[in-house]
């Protein structure tokens, strides 16, 4: 579909959604409070269904944009049914014909396919909203995968994101300050711009490979620069089982090793190197029989400022140590708490304690009987969403997406370890780098 056609379709959806909310506003004038709430929840669910249906028909960039926006919806007060519908925006697409992919590879790499590779499998290993992946063999016999960007997605990302932002704001789904909403969407735009530039992903791969080269529990594929451009990325092929198969067939020891490694590596990268793999989708991991993990897809990576990481870590550690006043001071520094207010602080403290359930100290089984963090977070989020003195700084958009993704995977692997000790050890590196100490 042309850019004009995409904008027309999204514009029509915006008009319909906005009109539905305006109609409910008028009807609400004569409804009781409970009837208004019930009608608005019903409308959120209907409009989430419309959004999913329209993005599904547009495919490509619109699907990827929709997934990114769906994580912002997690920060606002909409019913669970609407969240569930938005959660159906999977990063999958229909395969692009091999003839089209072959021509794109040859145009990007500047030569006939037969001279560039010993072989390339015409059947894709996978097709996502932004690109398609094929197994291949280099002339020297090295097994690789070749990732090819879909035609036109670079141009569609910005326009689709702008149209969706307009839809959500006009429809009053995102009832937050303009400053906060603008910051969220700037963050999403920045990450999506990077995802459609494979030179950026190649640099990310090299950064993570350098940092993790001596880690015994994970492996990062090597980039083959001679076969890589902005639209084609060639990297070492890793082997292993996808998460569902590993959960079913992996030994308890292997699942324990993998689960602890996922969490440990995440916190080591964040606190020690101020970088995270920001797309912890289950499909971005391959699990070996002994629990070693192959990390895939480095298009979505987030780097952080040292001072910001230091303040965020202080919030986490002070919450873990039950030092509320010190935690609030750092929340103000982060911009998460805009002013000292009793109700906002109570709500933020409950949220922080819920997020921190696995980190309070001693052995803890993620996904075990004592793990009710997910339920406690879900209970407090509606209050967080409507409190104007609480904000989600743009840094949190992908940080908490990544943290939530790791937690979700580990609820299936069920590792048992002292997560509190892991973050204390990792955060000590931040303190050394920033030259601070914690107050007791």
Region locations from a protein language model:
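Hydrophobic residue at the +6 position relative to the catalytic HRD Asp in the kinase catalytic loop
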Residues: 283-287
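Protein kinase catalytic-loop region centered on the HRD/HxD motif
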Residues: 266-275
């Amino acid at each position: 579909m042309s850019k004009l056609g995409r904008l027309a379709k999204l514009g029509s959806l915006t008009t319909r959604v906005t009109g539905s909310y305006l109609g409910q506003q008028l009807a609400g004038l004569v409804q009781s409070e409970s009837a208004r709430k019930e009608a608005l929840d019903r409308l959120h669910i209907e409009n989430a269904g419309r959004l999913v249906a329209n993005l599904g028909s547009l495919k490509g960039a619109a699907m990827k944009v929709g997934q990114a926006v769906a994580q912002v919806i997690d920060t606002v007060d909409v019913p669970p049914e609407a969240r569930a519908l938005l959660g159906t925006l999977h990063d999958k697409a229909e395969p692009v014909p091999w003839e089209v992919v072959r021509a794109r590879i040859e145009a990007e790499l500047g030569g006939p396919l037969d001279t560039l590779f010993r072989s390339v499998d015409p059947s894709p290993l996978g097709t996502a909203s932004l690109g398609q992946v094929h197994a291949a063999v280099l002339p020297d016999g090295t097994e690789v995968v070749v990732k090819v960007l879909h035609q036109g997605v670079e141009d569609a990302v910005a326009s689709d994101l702008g149209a969706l932002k307009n839809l959500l704001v006009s429809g009053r789904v995102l009832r937050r300050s303009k400053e906060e909403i603008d910051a969220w969407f700037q963050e999403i735009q920045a990450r999506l711009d990077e995802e459609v530039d494979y030179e950026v992903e190649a640099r990310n791969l090299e950064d993570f490979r350098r940092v993790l080269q001596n880690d015994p529990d994970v492996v990062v594929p090597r980039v083959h620069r001679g076969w890589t451009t902005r639209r084609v990325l060639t990297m070492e092929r890793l082997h292993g089982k996808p998460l569902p198969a590993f959960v079913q067939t992996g030994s308890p020891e292997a699942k324990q090793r993998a689960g602890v490694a996922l969490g440990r590596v995440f916190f080591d990268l964040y606190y020690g190197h101020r970088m995270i793999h920001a797309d912890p989708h289950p499909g971005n991991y391959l699990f070996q029989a002994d629990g070693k993990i192959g990390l895939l897809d480095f298009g979505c990576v987030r780097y952080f400022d040292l001072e910001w990481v230091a303040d965020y870590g202080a919030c986490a550690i002070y919450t873990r140590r039950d030092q509320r006043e010190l935690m609030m001071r750092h929340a103000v520094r982060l911009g998460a708490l805009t002013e000292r207010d009793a109700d906002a602080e109570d709500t933020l403290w409950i949220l922080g304690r819920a997020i921190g359930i696995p980190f309070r100290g001693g052995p803890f089984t993620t996904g075990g009987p004592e793990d009710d963090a997910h339920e406690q977070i879900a209970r407090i989020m509606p209050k967080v969403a409507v409190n104007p003195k609480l904000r989600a700084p743009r840094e949190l958009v992908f940080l908490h997406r990544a943290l939530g993704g790791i937690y979700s995977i580990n609820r299936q692997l069920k590792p048992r370890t002292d997560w509190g000790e892991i973050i204390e050890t990792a955060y000590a590196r931040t303190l050394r780098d920033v030259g601070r100490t914690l107050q007791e």
